[in-house]
């Protein structure tokens, strides 16, 4: 098994921040080098082991979607080769897993679009028959396809905390009504276009999370990762009907296998408390998870 890149170490650029997956470096005052590591987090805890090749796979998926959806909204890509801004001895850490992007002013909200009822949306629906203030028909079950995609924003949490679902009205208070309307309309258009493309490749995109920023001219710009298995719920179409009939989610092209293993593992006879440090991931879990991410990319680009 090839080694995972848990952390990039670039000496030629100043480090801005390390997130759950990405290491961001300043390139002058107007650009950022985003390096996607092989780190993996579950339950908001970063695992001690990485998934070899995950960062490159995520980057390739994001670039695929930026290309397919570029007609809808501008994105943060500069078009420049990330390798061009690092020292020769750093190229191997950067090639294939990085994006050189514009430095933007991020909007302080996550733009979540749901086409199916799952996860926190399903939980909220059971209690209120709505999700983030969006009323839904009675009688829906887990993994049900919604009559139309819905926009359910969330506030961005600090690393280690959960994002908090908010109403559209609250989002309008945070960023302004006009900008909120634009973000909602563009997010639904992005999701709808991507969902149609993915369906033709045998993938259901149940839900996804977009991030936007403003450039120096105030132009709304799509940023960060887009429609990757880390920011979206990807379901294989061939397993959907049987899972839906049983009221459960289909297996997904992401880290769900890791989450399931963590839920089942016992430490001194007790379940893991979902606090750092996480239990060490066995090799078979790592290999299976890497293959799952790879299959998502291969289906999309076939």
Swiss-Prot record:
Report if keyword Iron is assigned.
no
Its recorded reaction(s) are: 5-amino-1-(5-phospho-D-ribosyl)imidazole-4-carboxylate + L-aspartate + ATP = (2S)-2-[5-amino-1-(5-phospho-beta-D-ribosyl)imidazole-4-carboxamido]succinate + ADP + phosphate + 2 H(+)
Q: Which GO terms describe its cellular component?
A: cytoplasm
> What pathway does the UniProt record associate with this protein?
Purine metabolism; IMP biosynthesis via de novo pathway; 5-amino-1-(5-phospho-D-ribosyl)imidazole-4-carboxamide from 5-amino-1-(5-phospho-D-ribosyl)imidazole-4-carboxylate: step 1/2
EC code: 6.3.2.6
- A Pfam entry, by short name: SAICAR_synt
Instruction: Name the NCBIfam families for this protein.
Output: PRK13961.1, purC
The record's PANTHER family line, in alphabetical order, gives: PHOSPHORIBOSYLAMINOIMIDAZOLE-SUCCINOCARBOXAMIDE SYNTHASE
- Please give the family membership noted in the entry: Belongs to the SAICAR synthetase family.
For this entry, the protein name equals Phosphoribosylaminoimidazole-succinocarboxamide synthase
Upper lineage is: Bacteria, Pseudomonadati, Pseudomonadota, Betaproteobacteria, Burkholderiales
């Amino acid at each position: 098994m090839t080694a995972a890149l848990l952390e990039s170490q670039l000496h030629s650029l100043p480090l801005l921040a390390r997130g759950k997956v990405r290491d961001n470096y300043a390139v002058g005052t107007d650009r950022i080098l985003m390096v996607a590591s092989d780190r993996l987090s579950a339950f908001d805890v970063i695992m001690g082991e990485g998934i070899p090749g995950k960062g490159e796979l995520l980057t390739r998926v994001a670039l695929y979607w930026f290309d397919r959806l570029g007609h809808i909204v501008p994105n943060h890509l500069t078009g420049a080769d990330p390798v061009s801004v690092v020292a020769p001895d750093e190229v191997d850490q950067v090639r294939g897993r990085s994006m050189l992007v514009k430095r933007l002013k991020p909007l302080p909200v996550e733009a979540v679009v749901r086409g199916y009822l799952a996860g926190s949306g399903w939980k909220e629906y059971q209690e209120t028959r709505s999700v983030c203030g969006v009323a839904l028909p009675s009688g829906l079950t887990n993994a049900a396809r919604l009559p139309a995609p819905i926009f359910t924003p969330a506030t961005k949490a600090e690393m280690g905390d959960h994002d908090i679902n908010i109403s559209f009205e609250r989002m309008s208070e945070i960023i302004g009504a006009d900008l909120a309307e634009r973000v909602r309309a563009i997010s639904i258009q992005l999701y709808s276009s991507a969902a149609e493309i993915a369906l033709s490749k045998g993938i259901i995109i149940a839900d996804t999370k977009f991030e936007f920023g403003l450039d120096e001219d105030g132009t709304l710009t799509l940023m960060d990762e887009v429609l990757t298995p880390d920011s979206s719920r990807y379901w294989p179409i061939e397993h959907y009907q049987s899972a839906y009939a049983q009221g459960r989610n289909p297996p997904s092209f992401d880290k769900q296998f890791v989450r399931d293993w963590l839920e089942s593992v016992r430490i001194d006879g007790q379940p893991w408390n979902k606090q750092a440090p996480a239990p060490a991931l066995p090799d078979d879990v790592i290999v299976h998870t890497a293959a799952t991410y790879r299959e998502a990319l291969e289906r999309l680009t076939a």
